[in-house]
Amino acid sequence: MQTPTLGQLATENGAQVVGDPDLAITGLAPLDQAGPGELSFLSNPLYLQQALDAKAGAVIVSAADLERVRAEGKADGRNWLVARNPYVCFARVAQRFDRAANTDARTGIDARATVAPDAVVPASCYIGPNVVIEAGARLGERVRILANGYVGAHAQIGDDALLYANVSVYHHCVVGARAILHSGVVIGADGFGFAPDISASGVEYVKIPQTGRAVLGDDVEVGANTAIDRGAMADTVIEDGCKIDNQVQIAHNVRVGAHTVIAGCAAVSGSTRIGRFCVIGGAANFAGHLTIADRTTVSGGTSITKSITKPGGHFTSVFPFLPHGEWERNAAIVRGLSKLRERVVALERRLRGQAAGSQPSQD
């Protein structure tokens, strides 16, 4: 990759150079570690002091933060890349420097891979060692499937998708263009569907065949060891642009709206529909058959047990952390709230009765 100049990065990202546009940028680094020739960024005012002290070749900043630096008298003689959104600008520049994306130009099918004769694998694809691609599977252009991957019968993988080692895409499932699936991801395993057959001797759970698919849209990224189950009859759908973190469970028949992000260890029960542009915190969990409105934010660890119909809300159900002894005392109070409520209600009734009895006669 040719080393870009600060001016080139500004042009590519709609930013403005304050300083030397011909400065060669050799890499990216945090504010407190960046050296000459390296680019860093400031997107959180908590790190303003680090920006003031930084030895970076250049720093991505907002116009407002650059004025704060100037007010401290530390802007002159340094290089700045002024962007409307420094964090987004940094992300786009980082894509340019991403070694994994820019150096893996391999194509072809490794001799140790197994590809069904009728599978469609364009010459621009790379199929790594021990990959298995079953009958009728169709891959788009420039797909990369790394070691030990599995693509089931009649599954479809879109253009420019990247499947890291040990990813499994079950039969008939769909992965969209430019998707990134990290190691251990499983797309399209059976949903947790069993019909209880109750008798005098107990309960037998009869398996319900899961005949739907799991369908991922374009530009979806799924973190390591996440499972997205196939639908029971209809499909499980992850719409375009969703980003799902590690160890997330998406159950059968769930639909996740476009550009929603879900942090690690969250779990979504069957047939729940999450709207577009939602933000789901880590370890949040959702009961089944719910509807969650667009642009909803759910804090980490929150349990959602009812539908949310109003867009744009922020919901939290986690008890804040405290020193252990204080938490135990508060927990004891919480356990007694129902009895305390009964006492308050009884007291209110008694006070109302006393008030009624003390009013003067109208005779």
UniProtKB/Swiss-Prot annotation:
Active-site residues (renumbered): 252
Catalytic activity: a UDP-3-O-[(3R)-3-hydroxyacyl]-alpha-D-glucosamine + a (3R)-hydroxyacyl-[ACP] = a UDP-2-N,3-O-bis[(3R)-3-hydroxyacyl]-alpha-D-glucosamine + holo-[ACP] + H(+)
Record's GO cellular component terms: membrane
BP-aspect Gene Ontology terms: lipid A biosynthetic process
InterPro entries per UniProt: Hexapep (IPR001451), LpxD (IPR007691), Trimer_LpxA-like_sf (IPR011004), UDP_GlcNAc_AcTrfase_non-rep (IPR020573)
UniProt keyword Translocase, yes or no: no
EC category name: transferase
PROSITE patterns tied to this protein: HEXAPEP_TRANSFERASES
Function: Catalyzes the N-acylation of UDP-3-O-acylglucosamine using 3-hydroxyacyl-ACP as the acyl donor. Is involved in the biosynthesis of lipid A, a phosphorylated glycolipid that anchors the lipopolysaccharide to the outer membrane of the cell.
UniProt protein name: UDP-3-O-acylglucosamine N-acyltransferase
Record organism: Cupriavidus taiwanensis (strain DSM 17343 / BCRC 17206 / CCUG 44338 / CIP 107171 / LMG 19424 / R1) (Ralstonia taiwanensis (strain LMG 19424))
Lineage, opening ranks: Bacteria, Pseudomonadati, Pseudomonadota, Betaproteobacteria, Burkholderiales
